């Protein structure tokens, strides 16, 4: 893995983003922000899942008012997601949010952007410049207030970076230039509490846009694949796109966008980071895929253990194996392991047999050892 790109560090609430801070995991509420009770409940659920930053949609003034109450009832850093109307950003700052997300594709009046920047600067609140393929300004119209139609703006006719002829303007150029336009406004006002995202559904477009931006600005990058899909397809797409960038040392905070429970976004985000050894938060599960040699339902066992491990915060490696071929070896390499079969299970701790139990007792015995290991690591 390549050395991480060191960006300018900023603080989103009490979470440091960029610099040498760990890559943080964030999500977005899927409730109607105007429903305070439902939104607060979802935020608290996200916190329990390990989420470090939460973004809320702010479509109107009623949502802004609700945001103020949500802020009073929660402690996690909150980001106000703003589109179309700069006044919503100004009022969200009054509500006490920790960061703004502005879309340079649909707030393109320079004067209005400047108003928001001045207020954010006075409060030392960061701004994420969030460029999305689905809301890019018209080709030739970056920074112009006219032309909002996605059907006649020329964006869909732009070639991908890999398909463009030498010197030909590509969709990646358009994404990056849109971001740089708004970055320029912020920099002219001596505002540098900047975070940037450049999202598309297409992995090649997204990865190339982030690579280019990483080369020309010092600011932290928020990674994401937009509208990535359901829990299964979206997790795979996000793991590939985000994983490529993170492996190259690019990225300071991530959001896995899924058409699913927001907590799944958090779990998936941490799994991506743990797989690259960028975070050591929570248990890591090693499980065999099962085959004809297994005489225990490994799939059911592994999924049950995986669900139970979600509450474990220590970086424990847990192995679930179903036969004698790789089971003992893999289990011995884990902090806690189980090799099951023939109506019994061997529980391992740090490579040593801890006990042999009946199959009916293996789950409870395994989790007893996991909790003991968790307590030992937490104490250290």
Language-model segments: residues:
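N-terminal active-site wall of soluble small-molecule enzyme domains
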Residues: 42, 46, 55-95
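Conserved, mostly hydrophobic/aromatic
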Residues: 25, 81, 129, 196, ...
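Active-site mouth loops of central-metabolism enzymes
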Residues: 20-38, 57, 76-84, 140-141, ...
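Alpha-helix-loop-beta-strand connector modules within alpha/beta enzyme cores
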Residues: 61-82, 115-127, 213-221, 305-307
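Catalytic alpha/beta core domains of metabolic enzymes, predominantly
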Residues: 117, 128-131, 143-147, 151-313
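N-terminal amphipathic alpha-helix/helix-capping segment at the start of soluble metabolic enzymes
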Residues: 1-27, 121, 307
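Glycine-rich, proline-tolerant flexible connector loops at the mouths of alpha/beta enzymes
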Residues: 28-36, 47-69, 101-109, 194-203
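Hydrophobic or amphipathic alpha-helical targeting/insertion segments
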Residues: 87-128
């Amino acid at each position: 893995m390549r050395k991480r790109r060191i960006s300018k560090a900023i603080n989103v609430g009490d979470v440091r983003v960029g610099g040498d801070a760990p890559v943080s995991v964030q999500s977005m509420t899927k409730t109607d922000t105007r429903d305070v009770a439902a939104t607060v409940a979802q935020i608290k659920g996200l916190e329990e899942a390990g989420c470090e930053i939460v973004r809320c949609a702010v479509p109107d003034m009623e949502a802004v008012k609700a945001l103020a109450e949500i802020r009073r009832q929660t402690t996690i850093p909150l980001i106000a997601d703003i589109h179309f109307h700069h006044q919503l950003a100004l009022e969200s700052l009054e509500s006490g949010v920790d960061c703004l997300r502005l879309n340079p594709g649909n707030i393109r009046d320079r004067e209005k952007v400047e108003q928001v920047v001045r207020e954010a600067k006075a409060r030392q609140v960061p701004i994420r410049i969030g460029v999305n393929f689905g809301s890019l300004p018209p080709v030739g119209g970056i920074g112009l207030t006219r032309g909002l139609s996605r059907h006649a703006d020329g964006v869909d006719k732009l070639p991908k970076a890999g398909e463009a002829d030498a010197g030909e303007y590509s969709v990646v150029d358009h994404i990056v230039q849109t971001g740089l336009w708004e970055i320029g406004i912020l920099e002219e006002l001596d505002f540098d509490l900047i975070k940037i995202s450049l999202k598309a559904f297409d992995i090649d477009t997204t990865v190339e846009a982030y690579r280019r931006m990483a080369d020309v600005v010092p600011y932290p990058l928020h990674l994401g694949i937009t509208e990535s899909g359901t829990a299964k397809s979206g997790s795979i797409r996000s793991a590939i796109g985000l994983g490529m960038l993170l492996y190259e040392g690019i990225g300071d905070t991530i959001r896995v966008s899924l058409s699913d429970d927001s907590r799944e976004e958090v779990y998936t985000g941490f799994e991506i980071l743990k797989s690259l050894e960028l975070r050591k938060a929570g248990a890591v599960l090693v499980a065999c895929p099962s085959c004809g040699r297994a005489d225990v339902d490994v799939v059911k066992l592994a999924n049950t253990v995986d669900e139970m491990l979600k509450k474990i915060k220590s970086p424990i490696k847990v192995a679930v194996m179903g036969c004698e071929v790789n089971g003992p070896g893999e289990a011995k390499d884990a902090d806690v392991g189980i090799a099951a079969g023939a109506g019994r299970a061997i529980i391992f701790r740090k490579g040593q047999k801890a006990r042999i139990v009946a199959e009916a007792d293996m789950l409870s015995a395994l989790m007893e050892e996991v909790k003991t290991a968790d307590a030992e690591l937490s104490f250290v």
